[in-house]
């Protein structure tokens, strides 16, 4: 895998990825507690980019219209639940928001990696690592494995959605088999957490 030219070749940057509701956050939290390394969270940068008054915020409101603003927010924040619903249901809108945010998220992650240049190891949590082509900012990729039924149930509970809606969202992402071809490490997050904990302890 070729490394992005703006990044330090000697730094170890672990890209943690996996399907939606596969358990990435739980694993990232454990890694942070176990070896206390900086965590760069793509989802958090995505949220930051669409904060009120930002350039992306203005573009999102102009594109989707005033209804995308949360009417219950005192700061006129984007209604993220509505935005998610729209982009999950409409491929054109999904492509638009991805084209807007993904390059900026990648740019932010590169900037943060360089800020932590003296750290030997960083953890980059990137849900759409393969789909958004973020592989070149990682020196290795750790993929979370989770049974489809478990993943679906977690997503239904977390997002308060139907089984049909959960399945549609899962189907939008690359399947595990395709992702696993490009992963360096598989973390099995089925029923026994000790499986992936043992794997992590061996690797860090």
Curated annotation (Swiss-Prot):
Major localization class: cytoplasm
EC number: 2.7.1.24
InterPro entries: Depp_CoAkinase, P-loop_NTPase
Location of the protein in the cell: Cytoplasm
CDD domains xref list: DPCK
Pfam family, one: CoaE
Pathway(s) this gene product operates in, as recorded in its UniProt entry: Cofactor biosynthesis; coenzyme A biosynthesis; CoA from (R)-pantothenate: step 5/5
SUPFAM superfamilies according to UniProt: P-loop containing nucleoside triphosphate hydrolases
Keyword vocabulary terms for this entry: ATP-binding, Coenzyme A biosynthesis, Cytoplasm, Kinase, Nucleotide-binding, Transferase
Binding annotation for ATP: 21-26
Catalysis performed (reactions): 3'-dephospho-CoA + ATP = ADP + CoA + H(+)
Boundaries of every DPCK domain copy: 13-204
Coiled coil segments of this chain: none
Gene Ontology cellular component terms for the protein in this record: cytoplasm
Gene Ontology terms describing biological process: coenzyme A biosynthetic process
Molecular function as annotated in GO: ATP binding; dephospho-CoA kinase activity
Stored NCBIfam families: dephospho-CoA kinase
Function, in words: Catalyzes the phosphorylation of the 3'-hydroxyl group of dephosphocoenzyme A to form coenzyme A.
Entry's family note: Belongs to the CoaE family.
Annotated protein name in UniProt: Dephospho-CoA kinase
Origin organism lineage: Bacteria, Bacillati, Cyanobacteriota, Cyanophyceae, Synechococcales
The encoding gene: coaE
